[in-house]
């Protein structure tokens, strides 16, 4: 089972998740309380995983119609849902796992986490906003730009 399927398996009993061939070009996914989560049928596997995480973020964190992103409150709710998605499928532990497996390039990390590069970059931007340039986590120093991970014991502090 791939990561997209695992995420579907975790949530399908709580919210309907449908791949829809009729979605307009340019709309990757949408969550509504009536239809659940609709995903555009023209996505790649990694796009499905990335978009589903954000749409589940909407399910978990927002209510009501927030389509009009010129409304500041709606924009804030969109950001909250995206951040929820980042934390759901790209945890600091996942970045450390990549490091431990010698998965170091953006392409390799995205392939391993089954996400698109834009999702990873936006996630790292969010983590930089949350933690700053780097963060000590568990037994590691995670440098967020450019992404690099080091064991604390290997650092000359």
Give the role of each language-model region:
Residues 1-51, 56-157:
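Active-site hotspot residues in diverse enzymes, especially metal/ion-binding acidic/histidine motifs
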């Amino acid at each position: 089972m791939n990561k997209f399927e695992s995420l579907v398996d975790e949530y399908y009993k709580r919210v309907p998740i449908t791949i829809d061939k009729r979605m307009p070009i340019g709309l990757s996914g949408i969550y509504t309380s009536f239809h659940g989560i609709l995903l555009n049928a023209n996505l790649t596997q990694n796009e499905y995983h990335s978009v589903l995480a954000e749409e589940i973020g909407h399910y978990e964190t927002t209510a009501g119609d927030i389509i009009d992103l010129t409304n500041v409150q709606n924009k804030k709710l969109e950001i909250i849902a995206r951040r929820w998605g980042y934390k759901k499928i790209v945890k600091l532990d996942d970045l450390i796992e990549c490091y431990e497996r010698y998965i170091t390039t953006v392409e390799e990390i995205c392939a391993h986490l089954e996400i698109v590069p834009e999702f990873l970059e936006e996630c790292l931007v969010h983590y930089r906003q949350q933690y700053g340039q780097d963060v000590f986590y568990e037994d590691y120093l995670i440098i967020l730009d450019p992404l690099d991970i080091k064991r604390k014991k290997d650092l000359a502090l």
